[in-house]
Amino acid sequence: MNILHICVTSKWFNIDNKIVDHRP
């Protein structure tokens, strides 16, 4: 796994987490 790939995946995961957290 490339560091860049991990960074991008982490960012997407963080966004997904925020969306899920905002959902009731």
Swiss-Prot record:
Molecular function (Gene Ontology), one example: rRNA binding
Secretion signal, residue range per the UniProt entry: none
Cystine residue pairs: none
Residues engaged in binding L-tryptophan: W12
The keyword rRNA-binding belongs to this UniProt entry's keyword annotation: yes
Alphabetical UniProt keywords: Leader peptide, RNA-binding, rRNA-binding, Tryptophan catabolism
GO biological process: L-tryptophan catabolic process; positive regulation of L-tryptophan metabolic process; transcriptional attenuation by ribosome
Function: Required for tryptophan-regulated expression of the tna operon. In the presence of high levels of L-Trp release of this nascent peptide by release factor 2 (RF2, prfB) is inhibited. The ribosome stalls with Pro-24 in the P site and a UGA stop codon in the A site. This prevents transcription termination factor Rho binding, and thus allows transcription and translation of downstream TnaA and TnaB.
Quaternary data: In the presence of L-Trp stalls in the ribosomal exit tunnel near the constriction formed by ribosomal proteins uL4 and uL22, where it binds L-Trp, 23S rRNA, and probably contacts uL4 and uL22.
NCBIfam families, sorted: tnaC_leader
Identification of the protein by name: Tryptophanase operon leader peptide
Record gene name: tnaC
